[in-house]
């Protein structure tokens, strides 16, 4: 795992999100999760809401330009497909080196900045989280005492510009201070580095966090990810990590291509799934959990995945188990996709074909989403009870409990409590139109339990009258397509006593089925 990572130096990522007051693309107004404010909630809640992620690798991190490493220009349609598959976080790799001026100001090229921002808004348009970092900056970001003064000065200038540009974005934008900072070319580059390297990385993390916080606004309380040396989960690197200012809104960033000989080494094993394999992976996650999560420090696995060795069955088993095991320990995994999927070659982490908007490894993707506890809207739901040829279908006699028995309810609502903590909870609501005509503009009403109060809502607006709540679509999600189209919104609540679901749901005055 460690040496192989050296060869993928070009494949790592920087995710950047920037602040705009209004950007329009494809007829949709950006901002569904862009300007939601920054909540004062535990970092673990944010990580839980991120659920599972996908890296737009080898694109904005490509040296020289967006398409220099063979991937097409990023489109809104690409990110739509990622969201439809079940991913809730976009990590967007960006290299700033080559797009900034000389010392002492290191002025970032605004055309580059705005392109990164445009792509990030594709994700916000899909109610996603976005991570922004510094990616391939190894030419100047060197973890040595001799380089420390110069690097700190440049880090401060660069992060100050990025943070100021993104100041108005809410807590669905997460900054990541660096990507895999390490002593490039050293014999211990991928094996923990030296004490000097680890200490200087801690100082760089502190410099970046302080620069971000100093810009004020939402950045004063924004959630920020910081890596260990090389983003390694080795005991040496995680034990020596120092959290800047012991900031409660700092999240640990790790990369875990585990196990290396299966996930990354083209000459390694192509099989995975034994009891030993699973217990070994569990042990790696346990070490991270016991060091950080157990002690109140949230963790995101910013990069992971497996390469294509003509071993789909093993990759499916690995992807599902990896996601399930990570989630059980409160870790959010983000798949590294570099757009390269040719079987039998090195670095073939690609699972999504950006040229034709299809999945190169659909089974792997579905297993990964399944493991995290989600489902892909790109996969039609199959009936659990097949119709037998001896029993003709009749409109008056439903034959299986999986078939809706209320044909008059053309709309169904899924009310899902996605997370709860103490006296608070997060809820996601999805409205599905099973009818044959689109819904153009919707108002969803329900009766709230008397012990619950909504504190904030995104992708919709609400009015409360007693215990009756009326929720109306935002400007960009008012149309729900016919024959299975969906729109979603979410909110947080405070509650006392038992956390129960509301009752009496109607959409535009008509009762609907509730799940």
Swiss-Prot record:
Q: Which UniProt keywords apply?
A: Carbohydrate metabolism, Cellulose degradation, Glycosidase, Hydrolase, Polysaccharide degradation, Signal
Location of region: Disordered: 372-407
Recorded catalytic activity of this chain's protein: Endohydrolysis of (1->4)-beta-D-glucosidic linkages in cellulose, lichenin and cereal beta-D-glucans
Write out the GO cellular component annotations: cell surface; extracellular region
- GO biological process assignments: cellulose catabolic process
**Could you tell me what this protein is called?**
Endoglucanase D
Q: What does this protein do?
A: Has endoglucanase activity on carboxymethyl-cellulose (CMC), cellobiosidase activity on p-nitrophenyl-cellobioside (p-NPC), and partial hydrolytic activity on crystalline cellulose (Avicel).
**Residues in the active site?**
180 (proton donor), 303 (nucleophile)
**Residue spans with biased composition (Low complexity)?**
377-407
Region (Catalytic) residue ranges read 32-376
Q: Which InterPro entries match?
A: CBD2 (IPR001919), CBM2/CBM3_carb-bd_dom_sf (IPR008965), CBM2_carb-bd_dom_sf (IPR012291), Glyco_hydro_5 (IPR001547), Glyco_hydro_5_CS (IPR018087), Glycoside_hydrolase_SF (IPR017853), Glycosyl_hydrolase_5 (IPR050386)
State any single GO MF term: cellulase activity
Principal EC category? hydrolase
Q: Which domain of life is it from?
A: Bacteria
**Which PANTHER family does the entry link to?**
ENDOGLUCANASE, GLUCAN ENDO-1,6-BETA-GLUCOSIDASE B
Q: What is its EC number?
A: 3.2.1.4
All copies of the CBM2 domain together span 404-515
